[in-house]
Amino acid sequence: MSEMTPREIVHELNRHIIGQDNAKRSVAIALRNRWRRMQLEESLRVEVSPKNILMIGPTGVGKTEIARRLAKLANAPFIKVEATKFTEVGYVGKEVETIIRDLTDVAIKMTHQQAMEKVQYRAEEQAEERILDALLPPARDAWGQNEQSTEDTTSSNTRQIFRKKLREGKLDDKEIEVDVAAPQMGVEIMSPPGMEEMTNQLQGMFQNLAGDTKKKRKMKIKDAFKALTEEEAAKLVNQEELKESAIFNAENNGIVFIDEIDKICKRGDSSGPDVSREGVQRDLLPLIEGSTVSTKHGMVKTDHILFITSGAFQVAKPSDLIPELQGRLPIRVELEALSAHDFKRILTEPKASLTEQYIALMKTEDVGIEFTEDGINQIADAAWRVNETTENIGARRLHTVMERLMDEISFDATDRAGSKLVIDEAYVISKLGELVEDEDLSRFIL
C-alpha cells in the first residue's frame, strides 16, 4: 500500500483536481491512517476501525475524480461502484455483497501481478533456456538418449552465441516450434441477476475439468519468449499463498468508493417496499459496520475496509439517510461549487488539461493551436454563465463548450495542415457569443 504522507497525497491530487482542499485533506488523512494502522501491534490493530467518509457536493465539482485519482495513488485494492446499481436481497438486481466480491477479485489480480513481477527474472531465464533448447535440440542416438560426445564444448559455445543474439533481439522474428499451455476453453453461462457468484463457480469447475494441456505452436521468438515467461512465472507462484495474501490485503487495505449515495435516500412521497433505496441502505449497513462475506476465494471480513461515499444531495439531504448509516459515516466533507476563476484554472493548470489535450490532438494533423489568456478567460466565463442560467453541471460544462468551440477546427483540420490558429477572445465570442447570450439556445446546445 502507499506510504505517501498526507501532504504528498494532497500535492499529487492538486496536479489533477482544482480546489476542494477539504475533501483532499480528508481522503489524504484516511489513506495515511491505513498505513499507520498497519504499523501498530496486532492486539491494538484489530481495535482500530477506519473512519468512513461522506462527500457532499453538486455534480461536476470533483467527487468522482478524487476517487479515480485516489485509486492510482492508493496502491491498494480499490473499487468504485454506483449505489443505484443495487437492490435489496431477494429482488432482481445486484446485491451489495458483490461489492466485496469484486474488491477481492481486484486484490487477487493486484497480488498476482506483484508475485509475477518478483519471479520475473527467474521466469525469463527459464524461458530463455526453453527457446535455446528449441533452437539447438541436443543430438540423440538410435535409442532416443542424449549423446555424450567430445563436441560438448563446441555445443556450449554455439549455445552462448545464440544466447547473445537472443538477448540482443537479433532472433526476434525467427519462427520456432515450442510446447505452450493450450488456452483454456471459455464456457459462457447466462445467469440471472444476483447469481454471478454461482456462474463463476460453474465456469471454474468446467475449466478445471479440462486440465492443463500442452500444445505445439509455431510462433516468432519474441512472442514465444513472452508466452513462455508467463508460463514459467505461473509455475513459480504459490497460488494458495497468493490467495491468502490477497484476502489479507483486501481486508486490511481495501477501499470502496460508493458514488450517488443520495439516489438511494427514501423519498417522502413514496409508498410500498423501496427495494432499491432504503432496502439497499439496510443491506449496506452490515458491510460498513463489519461482517463476513463469502467469495469464491474464501471468507472476507469487512471490519477494516474503508468506505468513501459521495452524493450531490440536490433533492435529498444527508439526514434522509437512515440514522444507522449516518452513524457509520462520521467524517462529512462539503465540496464547493466551481467559480469562473476555478474554470480558468481547470483549463490550464492540471496535468493533461483540456487545452493541452486539444493542442496535442490537432498537432497529429500538423495544425498548431494556441490559446491566449483572454481566450481562456472567455471560455471559462462562457461555461460559468451557462451553468448559472441553466442546469449547473460543474466542470463537465467545459467539455461541452470546448467541443462546440473546436467543432469547425476539428472538422477542417486535414485541410489546414501546416497552419497555426490562435484562439483568442474575439474567436471565442464569434463561436459562442450568441449561444451564451440566448438562454433558450444554451439549454439545447450547450
From Swiss-Prot:
SMART domains: AAA (SM00382), ClpB_D2-small (SM01086)
Entry's localization field: Cytoplasm
A GO biological-process term: proteolysis involved in protein catabolic process
Cellular component, GO annotation: HslUV protease complex
First-listed, main subcellular location of the protein, grouped into a coarse class: cytoplasm
Keyword flag Chloroplast: no
Keywords, ordered alphabetically: ATP-binding, Chaperone, Cytoplasm, Nucleotide-binding
Transmembrane annotation, as ranges: none
UniProt-annotated binding residues for ATP: I18, G60, V61, G62, K63, T64, E65, D259, E324, R396
Family: Belongs to the ClpX chaperone family. HslU subfamily.
Xref: HAMAP family: HslU
Binding partners and assembly: A double ring-shaped homohexamer of HslV is capped on each side by a ring-shaped HslU homohexamer. The assembly of the HslU/HslV complex is dependent on binding of ATP.
PANTHER family for this protein: ATP-DEPENDENT CLP PROTEASE ATP-BINDING SUBUNIT CLPX-LIKE, MITOCHONDRIAL-RELATED, ATP-DEPENDENT PROTEASE ATPASE SUBUNIT HSLU
Protein name: ATP-dependent protease ATPase subunit HslU
Gene that this polypeptide is encoded by: hslU
